[in-house]
């Protein structure tokens, strides 16, 4: 399944993302776990498609991402890759699959062969040697800092990170260390907006935020969250883009437009220290 794309739509590459960041053009990212939604996101102009281990929550009904396996991530990556034509497709390395540089490389190769163009790893400055090992072996990396869902039990729940002076200083060290190790993108989750802005200014690579304020180079949401698939309580950083729309395509286009013009995230979607 594929859409007839606008001829002006160019393939999104890592240099293109860097150029967007340097020019101040916002980057839109959403999750997709299958061919049909990947094709739709690509058609709607989403620059980055994340095959996230969030599939454990939204596809499998798990309470955390921890049960998701590498084989499951590879399967969903294959599905999404078949629908994608021009967006940059990145995939999460699931919990427990990157304890050492060698193990991380083997896991990343599995995902790259399945169609990923970049892998995402969760962790702080301790992750730098693993990132360096991957990048030196032609595996592009997005480093995920702040609230790292794979560490939910160690963190004591899904809590905002970097609210104390010590926590903020550590996140700054994490970001710089991971960039120095070769990470081409840094994703920040549930980080006070002012801190995320400072980190973005301190880096030269693009930053992607989810609950990290409007000053990041781009934004990401879980597709099912922004489509309001789930009733009830939602994370503070989620906005219902189906509100007022008559189709999923229209909702996705509204999200892309809101990211591009800076109206999302608004103040109500962000955290303070």
Curated annotation (Swiss-Prot):
Known role: Catalyzes the reversible reaction in which hydroxymethyl group from 5,10-methylenetetrahydrofolate is transferred onto alpha-ketoisovalerate to form ketopantoate.
Protein name listed in UniProt: 3-methyl-2-oxobutanoate hydroxymethyltransferase
UniProt subunit comment: Homodecamer; pentamer of dimers.
Subcellular location: Cytoplasm
Co-factor binding details: Binds 1 Mg(2+) ion per subunit.
Gene from which this protein is expressed: panB
Domain of life of the native organism: Bacteria
EC number: 2.1.2.11
GO cellular component, as recorded: cytoplasm
Cofactor(s) recorded in Swiss-Prot or TrEMBL: Mg(2+)
Statement: the UniProt record of this protein carries the keyword Cytoplasm: yes
GO molecular function, one term: 3-methyl-2-oxobutanoate hydroxymethyltransferase activity
Upper classification of the organism: Bacteria, Pseudomonadati, Pseudomonadota, Betaproteobacteria, Burkholderiales
Species, as recorded: Cupriavidus necator (strain ATCC 17699 / DSM 428 / KCTC 22496 / NCIMB 10442 / H16 / Stanier 337)
Primary location class: cytoplasm
